[in-house]
């Protein structure tokens, strides 16, 4: 498609650790760039309603941990599924904005607490990254976008082993302000 990933790293991932990968979510290419960037096995946590999209949904529900954000029981199931993946040595990826904003002018929407709560409860480091160009290269608007660079910034890793659940908002704000 003519995209050239350029990665700048402030941190390196350790092979023997699981991580909570987070990034801004502005484009359909975010998932592919996350897979390209991390080089570690991981599973996405995503919205259950996306599993209803024809064809895409077939693969989506077989490869992701699905959450129904309106169902407390679903959130508990996500907690258990995430723990199972961490026990298998996998990492988890969540886009903390909870989806792509409908407003094309929003560059970074508010973060939801879920990724940070899960990371703290499981004592898993948070590995934030920023996708600078994805919205410009391949936005959700039809007939727009262009080939070119897709810059990724891998930020410092936030350790969670001393944090309590009450610290989730502070962790959320620190990562969002990167």
What are these regions (language model features)?
Residues 8, 65-68, 160:
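Short acidic-hydrophobic, aromatic-tinged amphipathic segments that line or gate anion-handling sites
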Residues 12, 51, 71, 133, ...:
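Residue-level detector of flexible, active-site-proximal loop/helix-junction positions
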Residues 2, 15-72:
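Catalytic core of membrane glycerolipid acyltransferases/transacylases, capturing the structured
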Residues 78-178:
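Non-catalytic C-terminal accessory region of glycerolipid acyltransferases
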Residues 1-8, 75-76, 134-137:
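Short gly/ser/thr-rich secondary-structure transition/capping motifs
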Residues 53-57, 76-78, 154:
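Short, charged, surface-exposed secondary-structure boundary motifs
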Residues 10-15, 144-145:
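A short beta-turn/loop motif at secondary-structure boundaries
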Residues 7, 21, 44, 152-154:
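Generic preference for hydrophobic
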């Amino acid at each position: 498609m003519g995209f050239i990933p350029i990665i700048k790293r402030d941190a390196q991932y350790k092979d023997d650790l699981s991580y909570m990968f987070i990034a801004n979510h502005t484009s359909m290419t975010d998932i592919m760039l996350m897979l390209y960037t991390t080089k570690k096995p991981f599973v996405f946590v995503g919205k259950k309603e996306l599993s209803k999209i024809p064809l895409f949904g077939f693969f989506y529900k077989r490869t992701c941990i699905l959450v129904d954000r309106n169902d407390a029981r679903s959130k508990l199931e996500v907690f258990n599924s995430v723990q199972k993946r961490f026990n298998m040595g996998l990492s988890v990826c969540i886009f903390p904005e909870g989806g792509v904003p409908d407003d094309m002018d929003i560059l970074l929407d508010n973060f939801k607490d879920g990724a940070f709560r899960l990371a703290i409860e499981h004592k898993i480091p948070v590995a934030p990254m920023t996708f600078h160009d994805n919205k410009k290269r391949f936005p959700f608007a039809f007939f727009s976008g262009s080939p070119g660079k897709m810059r990724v910034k891998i930020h410092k890793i936030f350790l969670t082993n001393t944090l309590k659940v009450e610290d989730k908002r502070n962790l959320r704000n620190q990562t969002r302000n990167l």
